[in-house]
Amino acid sequence: MKKTLLLLFTLLLALSAQSQNSLRLMTYNIKNANGMDDVCDFQRIADVINHIHPEVVALQELDSMTHRSGQKYVLGEIAGRTQMHAYFAPAIDYDGGKYGIGLLTKEIPVSLKTMTLPGREEARALIM
């Protein structure tokens, strides 16, 4: 796990080395795109991200093409509203689609890899 985190950190540093001295990272559990009011609102999620101005956003609890999200590619919806590049890593099949994690980046990464993580409970994914 430490090697994986080191690799991810190195990737993020490479992104920032192009033109900046700092890198703004954000992690966001979007709870299947449903807010505290149980309303699915992609623009509201994008507004939060746009307000922070991150170079990289790691998203958790992300639906893709599920019935509960209106069979939409949620990460693509958010990416379009934030002008960021989207990378999805499915962890499980769910509700007619996939459920997993995502990464949004301002710059196109040199290389990305997804993998499933071992465990006894619900399957997990990792983007490196």
Task: Give residue ranges: language-model regions.
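N-terminal active-site segment of His-dependent metallophosphoesterases
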Residues: 17-40
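Structured beta-strand-rich core segments of catalytic domains in phosphoester-bond hydrolases
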Residues: 22, 37-38, 62-128
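Active-site beta-strand/loop signature of hydrolases that rely on acidic residues for catalysis
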Residues: 23-30, 45-69, 104
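Extracytoplasmic/secreted proteins, especially bacterial periplasmic and envelope-associated proteins
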Residues: 40, 44-51, 73, 77
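Bacterial Sec-dependent N-terminal signal peptides
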Residues: 1-22
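N-terminal cationic amphipathic segment used for targeting or macromolecule association
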Residues: 12-15, 25, 56, 84
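Basic side chains
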Residues: 2-3, 24, 31, 124
